[in-house]
Amino acid sequence: MAAEAAAAQEVHSAAELQQPGTPSDAQENRKKLESLREQLASTPYVGAAMVVLSVFMPWISLGRMFDVTIMDISKGLMLAIIFIGAASAYAILKKKNYVLSAAMGHALLIFAVVAFIRYQSLLSEVKKTIFGAMASSAISLEWGGLLFLGGALNLCVVSVFLYTIEQLLPQGGALAGDVLFRTWKELVRAKVKLASIEVPAWCYSLVMGILLVMLFLQSGMNRMMH
């Protein structure tokens, strides 16, 4: 899906909210920000790689005898996850489109939350059976799901950090937790452009997340959980 993002004009930038103290402080802050930006330069590759690799790794293990992967249960879901993960990293590295990359990362997180809730629901249903305790102990989460969650968080966090750095560099503002939080809210409220229309980034994330959930609900894993 081709999409471009534009930050909301009405929201104050983090740079405006965090003014530098003295010229020497501003210069020192710029050095720290530039150093951090260099350190984060390759991080989106790591996040995207974690998301992509997760679809080939087990998410759930049944009695250590049968492993379930995204690739096995739904090719459509597998391709969608790979596309979103790669597109998010591309938006960060090539387009510097942090609104879009964060929105895609949030969509992956929405899917991760729903998948985990479904997993917990499965355990609750299994425990109600005659051999519930034994059966539920045989079902466990595997590295695939954790790798996916880590990759999605990586893409979201890096988007927030890099966008904050871009906002703070001109004035040499200091990087702080409250600034990062305000930047995150700004990214969520910003606009994502789809063709000729613009939608809030949170709405874009919700729609993409729902699409992933729908693919999951049609997958073999969900049928197996019933």
Regions found by a protein language model. Give the residues of each.
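Cys/His-rich metal-coordination motifs, chiefly Zn-binding "fingers/knuckles"
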Residues: M1-S13
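Compact integral membrane and secretory-pathway proteins
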Residues: P23-H226
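Cationic, low-complexity basic patches in intrinsically disordered or flexible, solvent-exposed regions
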Residues: Q19-P20
